Amino acid sequence: AVEETGRGLFEDKAVKNMFACEHVTNSIINQKTVGVISHDEITGITEIADPVGVICALTPVTNPTSTAIFKSLIALKTRNPIVFGFHPAAQKCSVAAAKIVRDAAIAAGAPENCIQWIEEPSMEASGELMNHPGVALILATGGNAMVRAAYSCGKPALGVGAGNVPAFIARTAKVGRAVNDIVLSKSFDMGLVCASEQAVILDEPIAAE
């Protein structure tokens, strides 16, 4: 990803990929996602989960491989096929990541076409994919314009765009530790993670410190 996009830090990209694989898998492995998943004896309400259908997944240039891994895993867990529209500037690394998950899934018994992608990516192709009548759900991660386009397709969409994350340092905090943690977080993968801190708000009594 670093070589193809020219963005980020190799070591941190590796950490994100491992987090996407291990943490996501461990957090959902015991969740029931199909069939009866809950029943309330008092209200008599039974909650039943069912696959939604084909998922359109758009991924960013900033976190291409980890996003591809994450979205593939949650699609497989919910028994939905997924078709990716990768960012054109991160096509090769994204395909490589998706192939690893796809091949492992097929080896475990998943359908052959459970994970697919647009071979020649473009913003126009991603738009066609989002608006395709066969798509049931959109998972859009990227710039604000693309996320807004996903929300405008007239079908269920979950969008993640650029964040404006504030960090609040309270008067009871260990200021040196807080500053160090914020710097470490903000500098992770050269600051590409959209959830990293963008602003710091200080409690007035410690502002000078």
Regions found by a protein language model. Give the residues of each.
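N-terminal Rossmann-like NAD(P)+-binding subdomain of aldehyde/semialdehyde dehydrogenases
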Residues: 1-45
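A structured beta-alpha segment of the ubiquitous adenosine-cofactor-binding alpha/beta core
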Residues: 29, 33-47, 115-135
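Conserved small-residue-rich beta-alpha loop and adjacent elements
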Residues: 29-104, 108, 144, 153-157, ...
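ALDH superfamily catalytic-core signature
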Residues: 77, 147-209
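Short acidic loop-to-helix transition motifs that present clustered carboxylates
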Residues: 120-124, 144-146, 164
